[in-house]
Amino acid sequence: MVNISSPLRFKWVAVILCTCSISSAGPVQIPNLQVPASAAVHQQAVKDIFLQSYSAYSEFAFGHDSLLPVSRSFVDDRNGWGATIVDAMGTMLLMDFTDLFNQALDFVTKIDFRQSNTPSSVSLFETTIRYVGGMISAYELSGKQHQILVDQAKQLVDKMVFAWAKPNQTIPFGEIFFANNSPIAAVNNVAEAGTLDVEWSRVTLYTGNQLYTKLSEGSVRTIAKLPSPFPGLPPQLVDPTDNMFVDAFLTWGGGTDSYLEYLIKYARITNTDDNLFADTWHAAVDSSIVELLRTSTIGGHTYLADWNAGEILLEGSHLACFHGGNWIFGGKLLNNQTIVDIGLKLVEACWNTYASTETGIGPEAFSFIAPNGNFSQPDAQQLAFNREHGFWITTSDYIQRPEVLESNFYAWRATGDTKYLDRAASAITSFQKFLIAKETNGFAGLNDVNNFTAGLEDDTESFWFAEVLKYLYLTFDDPENISLDNFVFNTEGQVFEAPPAKAVYGSSTPTAAAGQFQSKTSDGLALPEISPDPLVSIKPGPLDGQ
């Protein structure tokens, strides 16, 4: 058993970082924002990429989860329900691809979600954000005229509730077999356990069944009320059988990311009077500013480091780069300009990972040098790259992740600075130049963003359609369409209607769970099949300033 007392000094700093009185929520978007006339060309280019990508999927993989664009085949890695079709529906509607949407709708009406089409277990997290989120978003964007989309989403959620295996269980298991409604008894991570409430509360809204909100919201409440190393920042792994953390690893990256993301988004989309969600998010941000924020010794880039049992790890990831947009969004809702300004700095640092590579596309993971932290030891080539760019690549592939362009979209809508339009345009050019698989004319990932000759990754992710192309399209769209003051995005880029904003979100006082942080070993339950814990060997770095 590891016991780490929460630092008392945080409580003093939090008063400095937060406002001293409750401030009215500000609009997320700047008023009267308009895109220049040149935006139309880039928006059309995004539509063309969508059509080209989806045409390849339709020819070689229709009805299956994902296209393999190099091998001219498909993979069913999301239970064989046609993840790409469902995930892409909202983007089809926004782009006015009515025929494609009608085809997708016809397909979705025939899916039997009561059983998996593969022997695999069903992931609560992936199924919720892609399938449930995709169908509910399409229901709303199509004018709420296709009740079958709600019915199908309900069918899925009615199966997933069995992941709460016992009557008093508040955190679900992460995987379940639909054939016998039996969950896999394993440790969960807080992202997968805490990224259900936005979507499930929408299913409650359209069905009246409060159980969906009770279960999904209850998981978040449990995690938020567990004492953590720093207020608001939970460790990554949690045991659903006893509600105890299983590690002491803190990150805004994979395994924790969307739990933190949804705290403020759930407060906004529900307008709940319970300040727990906004205040816990505020606490997480304040803790991150105090404990995780680092400035690289070269380039002065602002990063959020990871933390593991008292050790700062100077590493970042594409997944974590959602944080800039999330801080901009939440900072605006809390009317906290400090949070917004730091969010914009995080956006800059993440964009630098794109601007620094041969392809103009950012890597999966990277490290950097900053005071007071440890990092993976760079080789000579990485060290030379760091001297020029202020970071070095540790995992070089690009698997069509959206987070950098997602945060770029938030920064554009919140500031009106056209540099964000220029960056989005450069990403379009890079995608057109480097991602096309000649075998299918579809779009693939990259094995090495800094060496195009390393070839393409043989996969077209469903979130290429749901997120990457949607965020790019909306960046060049009329800002009044899908305004950030009227809509909330789930972590898969699915768009949901939001009620008129409240006057105030949160109490202006970051919430800290009472008690002493405790963590245990994972002897009682198996870890997830693919643990999200970092695999990189971290050692003290003697290279500060190089």
Give the location of each predicted region:
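N-terminal signal peptide
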Residues: V2-N3, I16-V35
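Glycan-recognition and catalytic cores of secretory/periplasmic carbohydrate-active enzymes
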Residues: G26-Q546
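A positional/structural detector of protein chain ends, strongest at the extreme C-terminus
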Residues: M1-I4, D544-Q546
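Bacterial N-terminal signal peptides that target proteins for export
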Residues: V2-W12
